[in-house]
Amino acid sequence: MQIKQIEGALSAKDARFALVISRFNDFIGQKLMEGAIDCIRRHGGSEDNITIYRCPGAFELPMVAKKAALTGKYDALITLGAIIRGSTPHFDVVAAEATKGIAQASLETGVPIAFGVLTTENIEQAIERAGTKAGNKGFDAALTAIEMVNLYRNM
């Protein structure tokens, strides 16, 4: 007996994506968006198959992602933003709720939603993860979305 293995290819050809981006810490979100679009392009995707939704902050990402997923227009979504620790517990609340909400939206809709939201201790760490020393986490999230689209297609 041979074990069957199913996985997703890294081809964005004909895949439709929604990018849901937090405007808070927008200069970081912009860099993450550029990374995600670059990834989709490099893997055969078309800008014509990308829609961008902008919301006020990371707390709103799950709501917008779920509504976009429910339209049936997208094969996958990519959530992008930056939550940077400050001097109050606000960071912990927003980071936890955004993370849980995005996962819940994906589970409830059955549409893959990739998590490209940075949670960092300071602005320097966010900048590093948005295209400098630590790569671009928007690119990485898009790569996850591409793989998930193809995995779902193969199931």
Curated annotation (Swiss-Prot):
- Give the domain of life: Bacteria
Top-level EC class, please?
Answer: transferase
Q: Which UniProt keywords apply?
A: Riboflavin biosynthesis, Transferase
- The residues that the entry says bind 5-amino-6-(D-ribitylamino)uracil are 24, 58-60, 82-84, 115
Q: Where does (2S)-2-hydroxy-3-oxobutyl phosphate bind?
A: 87-88, 129
The catalytic residues are 90
Disulphide bridges, residue numbers = none
Q: Which InterPro entries match?
A: LS (IPR034964), LS/RS (IPR002180), LS/RS_sf (IPR036467)
Which pathway does this polypeptide act in? Cofactor biosynthesis; riboflavin biosynthesis; riboflavin from 2-hydroxy-3-oxobutyl phosphate and 5-amino-6-(D-ribitylamino)uracil: step 1/2
Which reaction does this enzyme catalyse, per its entry?
(2S)-2-hydroxy-3-oxobutyl phosphate + 5-amino-6-(D-ribitylamino)uracil = 6,7-dimethyl-8-(1-D-ribityl)lumazine + phosphate + 2 H2O + H(+)
**Pfam families on file:** DMRL_synthase
**What's the Enzyme Commission number for this chain?**
2.5.1.78
* Matching SUPFAM superfamilies: Lumazine synthase
Query: GO terms for biological process?
Result: riboflavin biosynthetic process
One Gene Ontology term of the molecular function aspect:
6,7-dimethyl-8-ribityllumazine synthase activity
What does UniProt give as GO cellular component? cytosol; riboflavin synthase complex
Family the UniProt entry places it in: Belongs to the DMRL synthase family.
The task this protein performs is described as: Catalyzes the formation of 6,7-dimethyl-8-ribityllumazine by condensation of 5-amino-6-(D-ribitylamino)uracil with 3,4-dihydroxy-2-butanone 4-phosphate. This is the penultimate step in the biosynthesis of riboflavin.
Database matches in NCBIfam families: lumazine-synth, PRK00061.1-4
Protein name (Swiss-Prot/TrEMBL): 6,7-dimethyl-8-ribityllumazine synthase
Organism from which the protein derives:
Chlorobium luteolum (strain DSM 273 / BCRC 81028 / 2530) (Pelodictyon luteolum)
Question: What gene is this protein translated from?
Answer: ribH
